[in-house]
């Protein structure tokens, strides 16, 4: 006997299916479900009178043969596709993406549910991989709370707290500081990796930081990013399979952008602030987007270009880089970094896939809790101003959505050698997952899962008779408590440090995971974001031309995902 349901009734019961479209928050972005892994009529759903009951959707299989957790009927948005599926989690990892149920009585089951299985209802929800922010100034540990609640589950950067050096640069300098920060990482329910200070012209000061646990090195102009330092740092990175991040020379003191590119010698490097106002060679740091060995990222304070962007940047810059507005030279330095034309071009370079990643620059001109919001605001602005991308039609923005989600998930993971563990929703990877109601997509997650366990969720009054009464706000869950914290989050280190036994020597509780493949990744590997245009920036007008086309756009006066969502 067949019961026919309308699309509306089906979506209300099991969530959208193939061909259904979903609006992301209050943007003009629409995604369309490309495939549904379920068999119609064999869907599983938990609740009174529902399917997942003993002998029905729940099998008699033992714990070893069933999922620990199943997220049912969720829409997955990832770089590889937009699909409807059940997601299985086992031993803290994504075990399968497919059709859940009882294989004894249901056809097509690829994920077995048993008495050992917990259920998270994904009907009507979007699931994305946990975000990865690769430009963190570890100025205050409270950043981690903000980042996690926004959907970021991995933070990479450097620092030691509100020291003057950390306020300006993302470096954890030296073995002593590295050990202390790795010990501090044990106390936070998020994946962490630290960058050492890369500004040295001899190898030993850099190698000892890698041996102490750094996953890479950071070159920053405030410490002197000279060609000699660049060359030495990249040589050490090549020897240790670690990544180098660079904030280039705004003042062009040690050379222009061409000198910096020459110092790279074709070696892989992550260029921070490949953007319109964040720093680096003025005014033409954007040129490095065209280099095959350069993995470019930009930060969120200029994302997207709005009518307020220029005004707020000057004061931020003076504070973050320890400048004095009463000193003419300091003021000139600041003003050289803030350019309307290059900020506008940054929007378009993101939309066309020339800029591969987006990060925060936390408390150092950027907002740690707004990486995901500002990524999707940029995508919305570009759709409104530039129309559909090649590959998208009138019905959906699937390709644009895949391009933008890759900027804060898989591409940062590939860049820093952690894609074997995190960065996408694929079997075998660490189960860092973010669940969103479509109306709140990108703004306020419904739930954040770390290593297969709920870490943060929107939760009502703990003294209420049910979970939903006000006040509803983000509260830490059991994955953040006791020994579970160290079992659900990872600390990334170098292979050199892992081989040296720093876990036991430092007394670390979290699992240490070595980075790998940092020196072989290239711009071509940046998923959906691999365009290498020839860029020219006019030294007088700052106009940006890419492959012969002038890149310019108007600032936005109104944005989605903004005040409508933050009344309190």
UniProtKB/Swiss-Prot annotation:
Note the coiled coil stretches, chain numbering. Answer: none
Q: How is it modified after translation?
A: Carboxylation allows a single lysine to coordinate two nickel ions.
Which gene is this protein's source?
ureC
**InterPro entries registered for this protein in UniProt:** Amidohydro-rel, Metal-dep_hydrolase_composite, Metal_Hydrolase, Urease_alpha_N_dom, Urease_alpha_subunit, Urease_AS, Urease_asu, Urease_asu_c
**Which pathway does this polypeptide act in?**
Nitrogen metabolism; urea degradation; CO(2) and NH(3) from urea (urease route): step 1/1
GO molecular-function terms, A-Z? nickel cation binding; urease activity
Q: Which UniProt keywords apply?
A: Cytoplasm, Hydrolase, Metal-binding, Nickel
Q: Where does Ni(2+) 1 bind?
A: 135, 137, 218, 361
GO biological process terms held by the UniProt record: urea catabolic process
Q: Does the keyword Transcription apply?
A: no
Where are the active-site residues found?
Answer: 321 (proton donor)
Q: Which reaction does it catalyse?
A: urea + 2 H2O + H(+) = hydrogencarbonate + 2 NH4(+)
Q: What is its cofactor? A: Ni cation
Recorded GO cellular component terms are: cytoplasm
Q: What is the recorded name of this protein?
A: Urease subunit alpha
Q: Which residues bind Ni(2+) 2?
A: 218, 247, 273
Q: How does it assemble?
A: Heterotrimer of UreA (gamma), UreB (beta) and UreC (alpha) subunits. Three heterotrimers associate to form the active enzyme.
Q: Which CDD domains match?
A: Urease_alpha (cd00375)
User: According to its UniProt record, where is this protein mainly located?
Assistant: cytoplasm
Its domain of life?
Bacteria
- Name its species: Burkholderia pseudomallei (strain 668)
Q: Where in the cell is it found?
A: Cytoplasm
- Give the sites modified to N6-carboxylysine: 218
Query: Any binding details for the cofactor?
Result: Binds 2 nickel ions per subunit.
Urease domain location is: 130-568
Keyword Cytoplasm applies? yes
